[in-house]
UniProtKB/Swiss-Prot annotation:
It comes from Bordetella avium (strain 197N). It comes from the Bacteria. This is 3-isopropylmalate dehydratase small subunit. GO terms for biological process: L-leucine biosynthetic process. One of its GO terms (molecular function) is 3-isopropylmalate dehydratase activity.
Length: 216
């Protein structure tokens, strides 16, 4: 997965609490057996005025002009600002996939649902927890100043506001290591491939009868 070290990006404010995973990526889009193509249907029920289904040409669908991601000032946003309990609801890894494929690298909110929080780290999306007061101030600033950007320094574990103030955030050391190096679960396993092969060779030598053999 893509490594995350330092990111500066435009901020889009999604000013609602309890954003659930079905709102992030509705259930009808989970039928796909592929891991790609979810970005165009991120927040589908909020983003479009009609009902979306897999296979539709989204370029021909009517947009909701009131939805934040459809407003010109937030086009190209790569940091999503949210309220508490972001990512609640059912477990679906498609939610961080959709956010990431839209172009978001980080989310900032006061709290997250546990499963969404864990899935985000595993897919290279950084979910940052700040206090409700810090988040509320950021909402005010983002709405007041078009083109508002934030910097996220994962090495130092700080969010840097436009006025230069720094807001510290916590992150588990192992998750931080994986993000900084771009390691997902498969990547971490492959780093141990030499040890895995050595173990398999030793096991075969000690217990050859464990290997399946074709029947004559």
């Amino acid at each position: 997965m893509q490594a995350f070290t330092f990111h500066e990006g435009l901020v889009a404010p999604l000013d609602r609490e309890n954003v659930d995973t079905d709102l992030i990526i509705p259930k009808q889009f989970l039928k796909s057996i592929k891991r790609t193509g979810f970005g165009p249907n991120l927040f589908d029920e909020l983003r479009y005025l009609d009902h979306g289904e897999p296979g539709m040409d989204n370029s021909k669908r009517p947009l909701n002009p009131d939805f934040v991601l459809n407003q010109p000032r937030y086009q190209g946003a790569s940091i999503l600002l949210g309220r508490k309990n972001f990512g609640c609801g059912s477990s679906r890894e498609h939610a961080p996939w959709a956010l990431q494929q839209y172009g978001f690298r980080a989310i900032i909110a006061p709290s997250y649902a546990d499963i969404f929080f864990n899935n985000s780290f595993k897919n290279g999306l950084l979910p940052i927890v700040l206090t409700e007061l810090e988040v509320a101030r950021l909402f005010d600033e983002v709405k007041a100043f078009p083109g508002y950007k934030l910097k996220v320094d994962l090495e130092r574990q700080v969010v840097i506001a436009a006025d230069g103030r720094e807001m510290a955030f916590e992150v588990d050391a192992f998750r931080k290591y994986c993000l900084l190096n771009g390691f997902d679960d498969i990547g971490l396993t492959l780093r141990q491939s030499d040890k895995i092969r050595a173990f398999e060779a030793e096991r075969l030598a000690r217990h050859p009868w464990l290997e399946s053999r074709p029947v004559a």
